[in-house]
Amino acid sequence: MDLPKTLHDFLLVFLGSGLILGSLGVVLLTNPIFSAFSLGLTLVCISLLYILSNSHFVAASQLLIYVGAINVLIIFGVMFMNGSEYYQDFRLWTVGDGMTLMVCTSIFISLITTIPDTSWYGIIWTTRSNQIIEQDLISTSQQIGIHLSTDFFLPFELISIILLAALIGAIVVARQ
């Protein structure tokens, strides 16, 4: 968006704060419904950050897929669960939590050290070796469609099969 710098910075800080608070709510809230709603807040803040960075197609995809489908499915699944079984054996800290914290911290540190050294310009504009897409010739939506039907056809189909299996599993669980 073409916003004044002060408004852009304010929105960036506001959405970043919402993102941090929502993600802390996902992890720290003990009620699964509140945790799922915090996940929805986090995903909406991410899509608004995409809008702020002029990635409107990615923002629309984020809202439709994650907030509109995945988060609704999570809330639907949480409402079918029996809530009493989660509060019987509640421990504040376990060995698995410590191991998970160590693994996540090491992944976070490796990402923080790797991301600034990456040449993102070459990754974004180069599709195959020695082939560069001209920005003025085709729009971003057409580029995404071309990539999904050529370069990323197999991963796209594999993801659709995985989602179909998850949908069938959800139907089987709901019928029981």
UniProtKB/Swiss-Prot annotation:
Keywords: Chloroplast, Membrane, NAD, NADP, Plastid, Plastoquinone, Quinone, Thylakoid, Translocase, Transmembrane, Transmembrane helix, Transport. Its main location: plastid. It is found in: Plastid, Chloroplast thylakoid membrane. It is an enzyme of class 7 (translocase). Its EC number is 7.1.1.-. InterPro entries: NAD(P)H-Q_Oxidoreduct_6 (IPR050290), NADH_UbQ/plastoQ_OxRdtase_su6 (IPR001457), Nuo/plastoQ_OxRdtase_6_NuoJ (IPR042106). It catalyses: a plastoquinone + NADH + (n+1) H(+)(in) = a plastoquinol + NAD(+) + n H(+)(out); a plastoquinone + NADPH + (n+1) H(+)(in) = a plastoquinol + NADP(+) + n H(+)(out). The keyword Transport applies. The keyword Translocase applies. One of its GO terms (cellular component) is chloroplast thylakoid membrane. The chain crosses the membrane at residues 10-30, 32-52, 63-83, 92-112, 152-172. NDH shuttles electrons from NAD(P)H:plastoquinone, via FMN and iron-sulfur (Fe-S) centers, to quinones in the photosynthetic chain and possibly in a chloroplast respiratory chain. The immediate electron acceptor for the enzyme in this species is believed to be plastoquinone. Couples the redox reaction to proton translocation, and thus conserves the redox energy in a proton gradient. Belongs to the complex I subunit 6 family. NDH is composed of at least 16 different subunits, 5 of which are encoded in the nucleus. This is NAD(P)H-quinone oxidoreductase subunit 6, chloroplastic. It comes from Lotus japonicus (Lotus corniculatus var. japonicus). The lineage of its organism: Eukaryota, Viridiplantae, Streptophyta, Embryophyta, Tracheophyta.
